[in-house]
Amino acid sequence: MDMDSGSMGVAFQPSEPIASTILCCECGVPTPPNAAAMCMDCIKMTTDITSGIPRESTVNHCRECERYMQPPNNWMIAPLESRELMAICLKKLRGLNQVRLVDANFIWTEPHSRRIKVKLTVQKEAFTNTILQQSFQVEFYVNNTQCPDCARTYTPHIWKAVCQVRQKVLHKRTFLYLEQIILKHKAHMNTVNIKETKDGIDFYFGQRAHAIKMVEFLSAVVPIRYKGSEELISEDFKSNTANYKFTYSIEIVPICKDDLVCLPKTVAKAHGNIAQLVVCTKVGPTIRFLDPLTLQTCDMLPSIYWRTPFPALADIPELTEFIVADVDLLGPTNGKYALADVELIKSSDGSTHLTRTHLGGILNAGNTVLAYHLAVTNFNNEVYDTLREDSIPEVVIVKKTYPQTKKKNRNWRLKTIGMQKAEDVKKQDIERQERDYELFLQNLEEDPELRQGVNLYKAPVKAIAVADTDMDEEDEVDEDIPQISVDELLDDVEAMHI
């Protein structure tokens, strides 16, 4: 049969497939087929994937060292709401390995409540092709206890190794600076005790590795040499074990900043043929010497010094005060130093002297300087006696001084290490320590390079108010006097009781 030309065909459109559903066995709501035969809402209500995870736990905290116990026997520093504290808390939850941890964060609590709350989000496959995600809170109780290291500090003779640091000089300015470096880098955190002796400091450690770490730290900041020894305490032949105590004797080079030194001839030639009569300008991992007549400098390694040791020719107590009458710059410079001819007037008798100095860039007529007056000083030094008289200047200028009108109450302060003081300290020693400490504070104010290795903290508000009052009472204040700006000071968080 022929189709009419005007008729139109109808296209076949298949119907959309209808997904099969089942009725939920709990509430009767149609739901896609699954192994539980329940809808998602009923699965969430009847299935708890966190049933094996405890909602409460305990973490051990040491009051002395502020460390938390990390199972099984480790103790670590973990500030509040830190990643380290979160790791400690999660390791306390036994059933956490049965689920997949998606998120974990702290819930704020009062610091004094001794509670730590953590919100966890986990996932787990409850049935075939059915993954559930739930969030819940876990509360940890902070159990204040005492770690083994802190417990040993209250027991005598518990140290395993000791570092005995010594320097054969008549002052303790080096140890004052070393104390601030140790505080800045927290190198004393592993000590069980620190004792101050007449000519040094003893650091006691519970482990030998901590003592070795201290020796390495000291060698990186001051020129030293050390010698190790061990003492047998007990021995067990059955188990083939022995108990030793280790001692590290550390000696710092007896050369300090601003000391006048006469180098042996062989040592001077080995260091760029520098002049034998030099001034020590810096003490660090190496010793830096400067020739004040030529501005030539050299750095000496501690190993070279101990190979041919030599004493300081003169130190700070032997400095004499002079007044600058005239300064004539010669032109040569070396960093912050500038060579100049200076005419000086001795403060005690008014005699005039001509000398050459490396401090021409900061000296002006009328300034006061401290210098070694070699023309009237006798030295008991064999190397110095071999020098030619025409190579020895009358006066060697070391540093510029400032009027002593500075306020006693400074707007900054230093922290100290809580160490056990030496016994039977004489009154003279106490007065000398106070003078050394005041001189150390003045050096910090005058030397910006020295302040880089020290943490300076803001003084309490009362001290600052008293200092401002003292400054108001002064008629005139020399602007040339070095002062420490507030930008260099740190806030003392411990003093704020945060």
UniProtKB/Swiss-Prot annotation:
It comes from Schizosaccharomyces pombe (strain 972 / ATCC 24843) (Fission yeast). The keyword rRNA-binding does not apply. InterPro entries: Nmd3, Nmd3_N, NMD3_OB, NMD_SH3. Acts as an adapter for the XPO1/CRM1-mediated export of the 60S ribosomal subunit. One of its GO terms (molecular function) is ribosomal large subunit binding. Keywords: Cytoplasm, Nucleus, Protein transport, Transport. Disulfide bonds: none annotated. This is 60S ribosomal export protein nmd3. Associates with the 60S ribosomal subunit. It comes from the Eukaryota.
